[in-house]
């Protein structure tokens, strides 16, 4: 079985070589098949030979539903969006974006310090927390984008000049009887508005 990407119709590509299969079925984004061991290598060669994907086709595309300021991220909005569940391929979870966000602080957490608990801040000083699950990757990127000194300031919770753009999901956090809305970042990049 296999899963595909939007730019590659896996089922059609497999059907172009249907003589190699015992049986094959699926749709553009996924397929399943039964094949003999002897036909496996000819299939691999045919699919690789006929593949017309470009580097651009392999870049993940994220579709933002709305640009949403921190002050708009409220529990009532979260509860309204929760009515759209369950999320899946045909009903994707709403994705929001904010540009020119500051990073107030990062604290590495988890058994191996692999997650980054972040506090983000907008231009008005409004703050929101978020958990980045690829925390070490985020720290490495911050060092590349802004330098070691700015990264150290962020880790110490000091004033810094880092600006990022974030794509995120809203998440409800319940801790010690307190309910709050957090960001669940999906993608973070150096802000297009950052000036060195």
Residue ranges and their predicted role:
Residues 1-196:
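Acidic, two-metal ion nucleic-acid-processing modules in DNA metabolism proteins
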């Amino acid at each position: 079985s296999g899963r595909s990407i939007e730019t590659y119709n896996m089922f059609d590509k497999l059907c172009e070589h249907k003589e190699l299969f015992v049986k094959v079925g699926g749709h553009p984004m996924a397929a399943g098949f039964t094949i003999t061991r002897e036909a496996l290598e000819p299939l691999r060669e045919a699919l690789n030979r006929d593949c017309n994907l470009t580097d651009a086709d392999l870049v993940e595309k994220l579709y933002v539903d709305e640009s949403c300021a921190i002050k708009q991220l409220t529990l009532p909005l979260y509860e309204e969006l929760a009515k759209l569940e369950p999320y899946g391929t045909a009903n994707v979870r709403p994705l929001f974006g904010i540009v020119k966000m500051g990073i107030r602080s990062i604290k590495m957490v988890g058994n191996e310090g692999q997650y980054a608990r972040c506090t983000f801040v907008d231009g008005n000083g409004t703050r929101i927390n978020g958990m980045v699950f690829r925390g070490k990757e985020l720290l490495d990127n911050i060092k590349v984008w802004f330098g070691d000194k700015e990264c150290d300031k962020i880790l110490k919770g000091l004033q810094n000049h880092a600006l990022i753009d974030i794509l995120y999901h809203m998440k409800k956090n319940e801790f010690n009887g307190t309910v709050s809305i957090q960001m669940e970042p999906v993608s973070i990049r150096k802000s297009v508005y950052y000036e060195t």
